């Protein structure tokens, strides 16, 4: 069994954003915002979570300054903050 499904939703969502859009984030560099196109519904289906749960996390990360949420997209402002979320619950 893939251990990804056992991780908490924040770690899974952060990992998905970073993996799915890693090339764009790497090309932009750590201090340049990157806008990623996807809907919260698409993310919820990929992660097996409710759209509402995804929305709550994205809004929390937005308040913390890691991302900026817009219609069918998000802008990654602080990729390192997302990387830390992926590592937080590793054994």
Which ranges hold each PLM region?
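Polybasic "coupling" helices that flank or enter modular domains
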Residues: 1-46
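Short, cationic-aromatic polyanion-contact patches
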Residues: 24-29, 39, 74-91
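Basic amphipathic alpha-helical segments that dock to polyanions
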Residues: 60-61
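Glycine-centered, phosphate/nucleic-acid-interacting loop/turn motifs that mediate DNA/RNA or nucleotide
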Residues: 65
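Beta-hairpin "wing" of winged helix-turn-helix
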Residues: 68-71
């Amino acid at each position: 069994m893939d251990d990804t499904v056992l991780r908490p939703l924040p770690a899974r969502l952060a990992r998905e954003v970073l993996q799915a859009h890693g090339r764009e984030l790497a090309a932009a560099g750590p201090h340049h915002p990157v806008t990623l196109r996807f809907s919260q519904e698409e993310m919820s289906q990929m992660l097996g979570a409710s759209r509402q749960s995804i929305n709550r996390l994205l809004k929390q990360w937005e308040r913390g300054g890691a991302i900026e949420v817009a219609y069918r997209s998000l802008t990654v402002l602080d990729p390192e903050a997302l990387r830390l979320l992926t590592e937080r619950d590793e054994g």
